Every structure is written in C-alpha cells, then in structure tokens.
C-alpha cells in the first residue's frame, strides 16, 4: 500500500474508487495498491 498525494492508475487493471471519502487504487497486482493521504 502506497500513500500518495496523487493517485494514478499504473496499469490497465487498476481501478480508482472512492471509499469513505478516500481515493483508492485497487488492482490485481498487489504492488499497485494506493491510497490518497
């Protein structure tokens, strides 16, 4: 899980979703997990 100021899709499978007011990136590739903070 990376915590970043700006979250971006890294690959085609990445999805940007908003969960409890927090932007997150979920993906099959575990390395690509991110959240905004």
From Swiss-Prot:
Database matches in SUPFAM superfamilies: Ribosomal protein L36 (SSF57840)
Keywords: Ribonucleoprotein, Ribosomal protein
GO cellular component: cytoplasm; ribonucleoprotein complex; ribosome
Transmembrane feature ranges: none
Highest taxon in the source lineage: Bacteria
GO MF annotation terms: structural constituent of ribosome
GO biological process terms held by the UniProt record: translation
UniProt keyword annotation of Zinc-finger present: no
One matching Pfam family: Ribosomal_L36
InterPro entries: Ribosomal_bL36 (IPR000473), Ribosomal_bL36_sp (IPR035977)
NCBIfam families named among the record's database cross-references: rpmJ_bact
Family: Belongs to the bacterial ribosomal protein bL36 family.
Protein name, as recorded: Large ribosomal subunit protein bL36
Organism of this sequence: Elusimicrobium minutum (strain Pei191)
């Amino acid at each position: 899980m990376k915590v970043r100021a700006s979250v971006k899709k890294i690959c085609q499978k990445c999805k940007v979703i908003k969960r409890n007011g927090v932007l997150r990136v979920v993906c099959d590739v575990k390395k690509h997990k991110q959240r905004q903070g």
